[in-house]
A protein has these predicted regions:
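An acidic/histidine-cluster motif and surrounding catalytic segment
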Residues: 1-95, 99-138
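Single conserved hydrophobic/aromatic residue that forms the stacking wall/gate
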Residues: 136-153
Length: 153
């Protein structure tokens, strides 16, 4: 039993990106979901930019500063977003198959705490742990000039 699983209660549907040729990574992701009592997840078959013909997705040439693997990664994330947009869900959590929920054990907050600090009209909220020794619990404030919130005049 995972005593920290409660911290992920309220997590939106997960779209997990996984290459068809990496079934062991999908199995590991499914095991992680089970350990964390996450049930609402979907596998998204990733594009492999090194092998797949992406000409029906990418028009023109790849950006000069991106290799084919990076293009495959970006297009896979776009594919996951398209899958999500077919639903009526208000938001989604898009991850790759190497995502690790283990640092959640050390959170002094829950997923619901995170969501309560995000502006109601957010479009994208990116989660990342770059340095697991430092966890910031407050999102950066939105640039007020770009906010869609009505002014109180």
């Amino acid at each position: 039993m995972n005593k920290a699983a409660y911290k992920l209660k309220g997590l939106p549907p997960i779209y997990c990106i996984n290459l068809d040729g990496e079934p062991h990574r999908w199995e590991a992701a499914e095991n992680m979901f089970k350990e964390w009592e996450v049930e609402n997840y979907t596998r998204v078959s990733a594009y492999d930019g090194r092998e797949d013909d992406l000409s029906d997705i990418i028009k023109g040439k790849y950006p000069d500063n991106m290799n084919s693997g990076e293009v495959g990664c970006v297009t896979s994330h776009l594919k996951a977003m398209k899958e999500f947009l077919k639903t009526d869900e208000p938001y989604a959590f898009i991850i790759e198959d190497d995502c690790d929920f283990d640092p959640v054990r050390y959170w002094s907050f829950t997923w619901r705490d995170i969501m309560s600090k995000i502006p109601y009209d957010f479009d994208v909220f990116q989660t990342a742990i770059i340095n697991p020794c430092l966890l910031y619990t407050s999102p950066s404030p939105r640039d007020k000039s770009s906010s869609r919130m009505p002014s109180s005049a």
